[in-house]
């Protein structure tokens, strides 16, 4: 007859005690800090989805990846990639097993909430020149006032040539800003709802104040600004109508905290998952299953468009691989597994009322899983099977990877979604995973280095797994 355990012994055996990964594994701090240095560099060079795609392509080419050829048959170990319309990346390492035994996909997104210039953005008012903007994604508009801003983009000229540019990132560059009311005259604004603290039509970027010297010239400040742009970039006002220009925070990624345990910066959502997913794919050697890393676009506005996951570009790539090898893509999809790599909210003690503590995810406890996302009654969610959650978490447990699982926040306050459902719609089982973020969708988000590192380890193990 077995000896009866004490309550304390039962507690040790049965209860789940969340732990902070760096506290439990001291060596993790050093490894996480080293990995974060590469990530910060990536973040600084990838302020827009175009820049993220271009930076990723440079990394892939340096690692020996070759451009994808649709009708070519590839051998195990070969590394291929393609760029979708300058804004999305697909990279793959051919596995030892046939495609019909399934792909292993990790999908993150590289677009972030921001301000876009309107088609006719340039105007003058009271001897000041401005750009009109149209916000992209779920920003809190009041957060974008009175901070240094940079302008990144591409012009397509009338002759068909194009030119990329960036102003505001170099120390010697000028910066730009959105002005706000002074508190002395803020009584009316103070009565606004928070969401209207700065309204969409007030998100106007200040870009100049000097006028041309000649008299009797209409809109002399606007003209002077345009002359400066023409002298440097060779563009006219009409060229704005065929441009893609984005306004982003001008600051660089920085360590946060006296202990430097965190990283603050713009664009963690979702480049904090995109970077480790890409590095894991690059480092993958001779996998059993073909691994596919996708850095997609347009997630922040519903994944629509030719570069979003509601498009077929990823699935066409997989189908073309199968067809060139004489294999059935439907069978391949049925045997595939996907990790939808997107950030989640980190529990914030300063805003505790937004969270349900027992089911929150915490900065420093490791990579976070979500069996489902959606809002309210799981609306628009992809709900992963328990078996898939078990398979992935067992892999991590066997390799001492810190992970946690939870929900976005309190029910009925709102919600959120990912690209998971668009992959699931193709018959591919998918599980949401990502790094918890403080101040998500703000111009300066914060993540814990340990969680970033654990995401990298998770993606690496997933790519190299035999099953």
Residues of each region from the PLM?
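N-terminal hydrophobic/helix-forming segments and targeting peptides
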Residues: 1-467
